[in-house]
Amino acid sequence: MSEVPEPRIIENPDGSKTIISFKIDGGKKLKITQRVKEIKITEKVNKSIAERRKWAKYGAEAGSGPGPNLSTTKLAEELQLRLAPSLKEVREQDSKEKEKEKQEGEKSLYVCRTCGIPGHFTTKCPFRDILGEMSGPAEGEGGLDAAVDTAMPAASAPGKYVPPSRRAGGRDPSSDVYKDQRERDDAMTLKIMQLNENADEMTIKQKLLSPFPNVPRVAVVRNKETGRSRGIAYVTFASEKDAETALRLLHGRGFMNLILQVDWSKPKK
């Protein structure tokens, strides 16, 4: 039987190697060709970790090479070490939270007379141009009341009946002042229909209108005799922009197993 030739290694242009070897199997000489490519992998580790890997082993592992010995060491998943915050950081966080609570408490001490929302003064109300200053003083000493009273004729004789709108301090409901206010309210009020009977004002505010923190008024229409909801509610928003956004988001949306129908409120004729 002929001798088995020595293995040959051929360097290829692409950096790989072709290894040709021979062996005898069942009286036959077999030629085995293998093509391998060496890939160098560089692992970057922390400097301190690299130093610890050089430490000399002791005990039963004395004299063993670097790295874990699978016969004596069991490898498990890598665990990330999370250090608890220091006492100083905890105290700083508590201090910030207390300061924030203090500021919120100070904001609630004053309420805007224009929109009724706490946190800012009447003179700095962001809804001043929309809501107007119906309760604030107007130009002149007597303000708006004095201007209206001046235009109202007084009773010509004592004992004569004077309508409430023409009495001192009264305002005519058909005047431009009330008309403008109604128009502003209608422009910021939506009519929500097909509401679940169990949805009250608090539920609508907290669950349906949660994206709108400033909702001045929510009124559910109820049966006068039974007090049950008729599935209709009127919602007045802080601005016309908020009302338009709510109309776009809520119309056709499912709420408490019913599909809502939302539209602008219609003034009573």
UniProtKB/Swiss-Prot annotation:
Region feature Disordered, mapped onto this chain: 155-183
Span of domain RRM: 188-267
Molecular function in Gene Ontology: RNA binding; translation initiation factor activity; zinc ion binding
Biological processes annotated in GO: formation of cytoplasmic translation initiation complex; translation reinitiation; translational termination
InterPro entries documented for this protein: eIF3_g, eIF3g_N, eIF3G_RRM, Nucleotide-bd_a/b_plait_sf, RBD_domain_sf, RRM_dom, Znf_CCHC, Znf_CCHC_sf
Chief localization: cytoplasm
Subcellular location: Cytoplasm
Basic and acidic residues composition-biased segments: 169-183
Keywords assigned by UniProt, alphabetized: Cytoplasm, Initiation factor, Phosphoprotein, Protein biosynthesis, RNA-binding
Modified residues (Phosphoserine): 64, 135, 156, 165
Cellular component aspect of the GO annotation: eukaryotic 43S preinitiation complex; eukaryotic 48S preinitiation complex; eukaryotic translation initiation factor 3 complex, eIF3e; eukaryotic translation initiation factor 3 complex, eIF3m; multi-eIF complex
Functional description taken from the UniProt entry: RNA-binding component of the eukaryotic translation initiation factor 3 (eIF-3) complex, which is involved in protein synthesis of a specialized repertoire of mRNAs and, together with other initiation factors, stimulates binding of mRNA and methionyl-tRNAi to the 40S ribosome. The eIF-3 complex specifically targets and initiates translation of a subset of mRNAs involved in cell proliferation. This subunit can bind 18S rRNA.
Assembly: Component of the eukaryotic translation initiation factor 3 (eIF-3) complex.
HAMAP family the UniProt entry points to: eIF3g
PANTHER family: EUKARYOTIC TRANSLATION INITIATION FACTOR 3 SUBUNIT G
Family: Belongs to the eIF-3 subunit G family.
Name used for this protein in its record: Eukaryotic translation initiation factor 3 subunit G
Species annotation: Eremothecium gossypii (strain ATCC 10895 / CBS 109.51 / FGSC 9923 / NRRL Y-1056) (Yeast)
